[in-house]
Amino acid sequence: MKRETCSTQKHTFDSSNNSYHVELESIQYVDEIEIHWNFRYEYKYEIEISLDSIHWVKLSKGEYVSSDLVSRNIIRANTGYIRIKLADQSADRFSEAMKHVLVYSGTAAEFIKGVDVSHLTQIEDFGGKFYDRQGRERDCLEILKEYGCNYVRLKVWNKPGLPNSDPAGYNDKAHVLGMAKRAVDKGYRLLIDFHYSDWWADPGKQFIPDDWKDLSLEQLNTALYDFTYEVLNALKLQGTLPEMVQIGNEITNGMLWDVAKVSDEFDTPEQWDKLCTLLKSGISAVKAISESIRTVIHIERGGDNEKSRYFYDMLAERNVAYDIIGLSYYPIWHGPIKDFSSNIRDLYDRYSKEILVAEVAYPYTAENGDDQLNASSFPFTNIPEEYPPSIQSQADILQAVIYELKSIPDNKGIGFFYWQPDFIPVKGAGWKYGEGCEWDDQTLFDFKGNTLWSLDVFKLHS
């Protein structure tokens, strides 16, 4: 079958940075390019793409190597400009070697470009404001929508409030209903993230809700089902039915501790049975609301294949019928892109499930916007040398994650959610009541709420 080529305006060499430029007639979806060489050689090169020829993003995690006369490279992005940079040859050598480049169009698969904005209302209530790249004050959700964001992720806490270190009224059922309506009215689709806790739930803490702490396993099973059903039914009744629902948040070590904890001395068949029984209850509640809602089981081991396989094997052995594998992947904690890439490919091969990056973020600065220690400064953090904190690195990392997701066969890498792109430093609206924000260096807005150009990466992808 004949492939359609994109309309290109001009092809030029740039000797100043040893690169070959292709300018398209307009921003178009490019499926792949073919580089035709005049003679055989082991060429090492990078590919960059841009919407405006000012801000460039690396297509993937590193160099391409080719010794063929024709090199085919998958792009799968919307772009107006393509730049091929030869890594180890002089400009003269490059211009002699390069024959021409063909640019092919295609049909883009649906792709999730989501944001978790669970704390947006709190940030706004305490005075946070957001500005577009023209300096105009705007609704944060409207700015994100203009860059192509199409999903909002909202977490649900059972009964937040002191003494659980966060003000009541945020991330509870009523708050989620309000945010869901606001997001859907602006054209977003929804993922609802049940923490099954009154506060943060992650691998280091899965505090059982205070109202559930004295329940037996059987009673807990019923309470989890009822709470899940109640929240989702309320969303359904107001016309904001979610597309996806997470049963638990980063539950690598289990949830509802210690009842369904599965780490350390709790890593026993009996404990895994308890966890999977509870997961099945949550899934049943979701499907009772609508069979169309896809369920996500989410862990935080984006770069750890051994632990990921162990976790999802335990679920497979117990016939947990979920739809999507959800992973957190923070490069500063979870290892290099190559580890993430090999993990998601193996998980797809092993379980034939769709793969979703439920959380991702990266620092755009080494500065701190307030006096709260940033999460990127924690002792176990490892900033990759090739990606020093900068807007450019933030854009390149996000594009690399997307590239790997789109490389999974059959379009099974379905997308990502950027975690708290709006968490700018606003007094009183930090991660914990009365404290500052430990995430202000990983947002998609600067400390004053101005939009960063790294949001262009969202626009690159359909």
Describe each region flagged by the PLM.
Residues 123-135, 160-174, 252-255, 300-309, ...:
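Acidic-and-aromatic substrate-binding clefts and catalytic sites of carbohydrate-active enzymes
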Residues 264-265, 342, 346-347, 365-400, ...:
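Aromatic-rich peripheral "rim/lid" segments of glycoside hydrolase catalytic domains that contact
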Residues 117-120, 157-159, 195-199, 247-252, ...:
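Active-site beta-loop-alpha junctions enriched in small/polar residues
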Residues 5-108:
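Aromatic, loop-rich ligand-recognition surfaces of beta-strand-rich domains
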Residues 115, 144, 193, 245, ...:
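Conserved, mostly hydrophobic/aromatic
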Residues 143-271, 275-294, 300:
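Substrate-binding cleft and catalytic face of glycoside hydrolase catalytic domains
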Residues 107-143:
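Boundary/entry segment of secreted carbohydrate-active catalytic domains
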Residues 134, 138-141, 288-295, 305-383, ...:
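Glycoside hydrolase catalytic-domain groove-lining segments
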